[in-house]
């Protein structure tokens, strides 16, 4: 199958080094979605919390300020009625959550993977590695094994499973895939990030207000990428983005700023008030280290895929770096149309970037710019910085 979009054969090779490239992207969401303006009623009604009127008003204000228009979910009103433990704060519902996630997470990942494979246009037998990331449940063998079987991949496929890394895991998965692609001749790596909020859905509770912050943002989605070095142009492979470097940094002084723990009630997360300033005040050092080899210091000369962990985080990071709104359109679009899908978000943004660049007549997949940065943000606090190079679009 021919690629849906035509790109240059540029593959980022230089100075004798094989560079990994993104060769295809696929994304998907559950069909069920809820408009953000309707979510407070849905949430409080289905958790039998309508009597908590003051908390509901607070939740409404959080939703309004989120700049999210809609979110997609596996959990529907019917499913919540059938699983009252999930909708009851503190109830022992881990078994019910796991039953959902063990099936639905690989299934959603499979849907995204099939889209990426179709765009790639190569035989599925060429996939040599799988990297699967999720913070939605856990099992043995893992979701990496299940999706390998669902897709009918070779039994010799080499798998990496990244469980419970949190929202920065999209960057982690790309970093691992880059190393695999560049250090294994002919490797083609299927990267899958799939998230389902069944593990973190909780009823509101006055003594744990972090819950309602997450309920106003988190959502379900999956993204898949094919990563490889030296695209086989003769067979129709084309780079979408080139991956120049990838790094991970623990933010100093951030221990305990975002944590999550598993209980009989599922996964419960805890947020400190200084999350935004910690990311904001430390992002410049990360960017300087990532881009100094390229001699880049003008942050507005780049395109961006910033994990949309919330409007405040985007505003904080962008404000510190002086990034103009025009360079954040794709990031804010994904936040608005999908919410925070955890590890999958940054890949949705890459997909939006290359598609909007084509629609708007830009010369490259990076909104007309040559270099860009994918920024994963999450627990630790941890920052993943993936330096990308766009490729020319053949108009």
UniProtKB/Swiss-Prot annotation:
Keyword NAD appears in the UniProt entry: no
Biophysicochemical property: temperature dependence: Optimum temperature is 35 degrees Celsius.
Transferase recorded as keyword: yes
Enzyme Commission number(s) from the entry: 2.3.1.220, 2.3.1.151
GO molecular function list: acyltransferase activity; tetrahydroxybenzophenone synthase activity; trihydroxybenzophenone synthase activity
CDD domains recorded: CHS_like
Catalytic activity: benzoyl-CoA + 3 malonyl-CoA + 2 H(+) = 2,4,6-trihydroxybenzophenone + 3 CO2 + 4 CoA; 3-hydroxybenzoyl-CoA + 3 malonyl-CoA + 2 H(+) = 2,3',4,6-tetrahydroxybenzophenone + 3 CO2 + 4 CoA
Gene3D superfamilies: 3.40.47.10
One annotated GO biological process: benzoyl-CoA metabolic process
Keyword entries, A-Z: Acyltransferase, Transferase
InterPro entries: Chalcone/stilbene_synt_C (IPR012328), Chalcone/stilbene_synt_N (IPR001099), Polyketide_synthase_type-III (IPR011141), Thiolase-like (IPR016039)
pH dependence: Optimum pH is 6.5-7.0.
Active site residues according to the UniProt entry: 167
Family to which this protein belongs: Belongs to the thiolase-like superfamily. Chalcone/stilbene synthases family.
Any further remark recorded for this protein: The T135L mutagenesis transforms the trihydroxybenzophenone synthase into a phenylpyrone synthase.
Functional summary from the UniProt entry: Type III polyketide synthase involved in the biosynthesis of benzophenones and xanthones. The preferred substrate is benzoyl-CoA, but can also use 3-hydroxybenzoyl-CoA with a lower activity.
Assembly and binders: Homodimer.
Protein name: 2,4,6-trihydroxybenzophenone synthase
